[in-house]
């Protein structure tokens, strides 16, 4: 029986995108940490959601279906990530995001070629093995291959910056969906759109426009956000009548910060919109 306040994490990644852990392992881990509800929000895909829901039923943990759509602000050029929750038409969202996943995959394979040309002992086949389940190569998979070859002590650090930082030797600009289109896509697919970590990419000033289009919420609890950031997000939510979410942005071994699920201390009332809108698929 769920308490009035539910310990939840609405932002977790699996190995369907750029997380290192499989969905069964993630669900068991979240349960062991005392979480009662989670959302696995892989980048631009909902491929693992049905498995997650079944695992949740097995282990007594509430699964809120979700995805994190990678997008950009067409006026500023800055990245904007939009979380989509309780998406009814999962196939529709999957099909709309598929071209961008393929573009990401091709871009990162080109990065592998640039890295190999610079003298690093990796190739495309090596890296693809790390992208096992989802099939899309991410920068974390490239770095994992380099870590396993003893060329970097971890995923993030000087080598990551050298390769993928601004002006890095393997930096290739990604192709993203317009953020306004991302919000509309989530709505068209029957979901709720939430602006992810608005201070990580300086997208807080984009809230008024996205709210006009049907944005439902703001992720105010995230490891990149200070108490001052959180207060600003709360005020924006009050002004635009949006709800608040939070999550660890956990990626397992691929996490930029070693923060486990639930580490943001997120507890939500049982009548929170994500629970209230929940559809038992």
Feature names for model-found ranges:
Residues 155, 255-257:
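Short acidic/His/Gly/Ser-rich catalytic and metal-binding motifs that mark active-site loops
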Residues 259-270:
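Conserved, well-ordered active-site substructure
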Residues 1-79, 162-165, 171, 178-196, ...:
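An N-terminally biased module of ancient metal coordination in phosphate/nucleic-acid-related enzymes
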């Amino acid at each position: 029986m769920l308490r009035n306040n539910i310990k939840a994490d609405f932002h977790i990644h699996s190995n369907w995108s750029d997380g290192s852990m499989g969905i069964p392992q993630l669900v068991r881990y979240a349960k062991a940490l005392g979480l009662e509800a989670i959302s696995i929000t892989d980048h631009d895909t909902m491929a693992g959601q049905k498995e997650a829901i079944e695992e949740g039923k097995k282990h007594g943990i509430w699964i809120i279906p979700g995805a994190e759509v990678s997008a950009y602000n067409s006026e500023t050029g800055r990245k904007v990530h939009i979380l989509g929750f309780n998406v009814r038409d999962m196939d529709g969202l999957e099909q709309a995001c598929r071209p961008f996943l393929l573009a990401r995959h091709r871009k990162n394979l080109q990065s592998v070629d640039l890295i190999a040309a610079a003298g690093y002992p990796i190739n495309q086949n090596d890296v693809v093995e790390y992208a096992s389940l989802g099939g899309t190569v991410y920068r974390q998979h490239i770095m994992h291959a380099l870590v396993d070859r003893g060329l970097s002590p971890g995923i993030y650090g000087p080598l990551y910056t050298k390769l993928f930082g601004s002006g890095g030797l393997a930096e290739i600009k990604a192709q993203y969906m317009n953020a306004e289109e991302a919000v509309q896509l989530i709505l068209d697919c029957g979901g709720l759109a939430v602006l992810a970590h608005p201070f990580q990419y300086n997208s807080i000033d984009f809230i008024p426009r996205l709210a006009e289009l049907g944005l439902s919420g703001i992720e105010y609890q995230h490891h990149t956000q200070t108490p001052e950031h959180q207060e600003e997000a709360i005020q924006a939510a009050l002004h635009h009548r949006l709800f608040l979410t939070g999550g660890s942005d956990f990626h397992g071994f691929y996490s930029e910060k070693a923060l486990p699920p639930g580490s943001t201390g997120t507890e939500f009332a049982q009548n929170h919109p994500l629970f209230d809108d929940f559809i038992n698929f």
